[in-house]
């Protein structure tokens, strides 16, 4: 039996982004905002899997995760307006928006920067005997960076509770991956380090949750 609330969250998340986009097109925001249309399913699944001691480390494209964790469009939009009534009192805007009270520890607008931060958070959990899992979201561009490979190796070497989610739309700005570089076989990379790897290729959040 499907949980109706999962579907409701998917629809709500899409509508929130559409509303933000309409205001963005009118030039109401003075900061760049990266929408996540089409990325809703994974975000809903992660949101519903997170426990109290778990945490999220995000990229510049964090609107979907922050909306779900906050459960409110108003405070996030106020943050985009850089108002004091925003999630972070108008100080973080969009690309660096974090909300530690809702398990969002850090967001970074620098390519690959959040990976070593997340790895450090996972190490901190281990050293302080916290059983939480750190979920870090990255993209297909960041997996080309040394920070990605080093974070994988460090996390495995130290048995850290770290889950890396790679959102891959096979585009880097205006160029397809096939035009720009050789393919990176993440399944083989994970196997070489004896790391669990799962490829999720549908928009079915129930598949991700289970």
Show which residues each predicted segment covers:
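Thiamine diphosphate
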Residues: 158, 162, 166-210
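Conserved structured core elements
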Residues: 14, 145-146, 206-209
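A short, structure-level motif marking secondary-structure boundaries and short turns
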Residues: 5, 135-137, 170-172
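Conserved N-terminal diphosphate/IPP-binding helix and adjacent helical/loop segment
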Residues: 9, 13-20
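Short, surface-exposed alpha-helical recognition segments that flank or form part
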Residues: 8, 112, 203
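Cofactor-binding active-site loop characterized by glycine-rich and histidine/acidic residues
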Residues: 18-22, 28-158, 176-182, 187-194
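Positively charged, low-complexity intrinsically disordered leader regions
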Residues: 1-11
């Amino acid at each position: 039996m499907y949980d109706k609330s999962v579907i409701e969250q998917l629809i709500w998340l899409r509508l929130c982004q559409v509303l933000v986009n309409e205001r963005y097109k009118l030039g109401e925001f003075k900061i760049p905002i990266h929408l996540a249309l089409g990325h809703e399913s994974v975000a809903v699944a992660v949101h519903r899997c997170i426990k109290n001691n778990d945490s999220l480390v995000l990229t510049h494209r964090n609107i979907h995760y922050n909306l779900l964790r906050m459960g409110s469009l108003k405070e996030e939009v106020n943050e985009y307006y850089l108002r004091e009534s925003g999630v972070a009192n108008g100080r973080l805007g969009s690309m660096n928006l974090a909300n530690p009270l809702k398990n969002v520890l850090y967001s970074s607008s620098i390519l690959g920067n959040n990976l070593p931060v997340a790895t450090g958070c996972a190490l901190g959990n281990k050293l302080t005997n916290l059983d939480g899992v750190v979920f870090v979201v990255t993209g297909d561009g960041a997996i080309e960076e040394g920070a990605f490979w080093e974070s994988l190796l460090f996390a495995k070497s130290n048995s850290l509770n770290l889950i890396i989610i790679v959102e891959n739309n096979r585009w880097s700005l205006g160029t397809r991956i096939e035009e720009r570089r050789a393919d990176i076989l993440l399944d083989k990379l994970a196997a070489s380090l004896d790391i669990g790897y799962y490829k999720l290729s549908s928009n079915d959040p129930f598949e991700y949750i289970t």
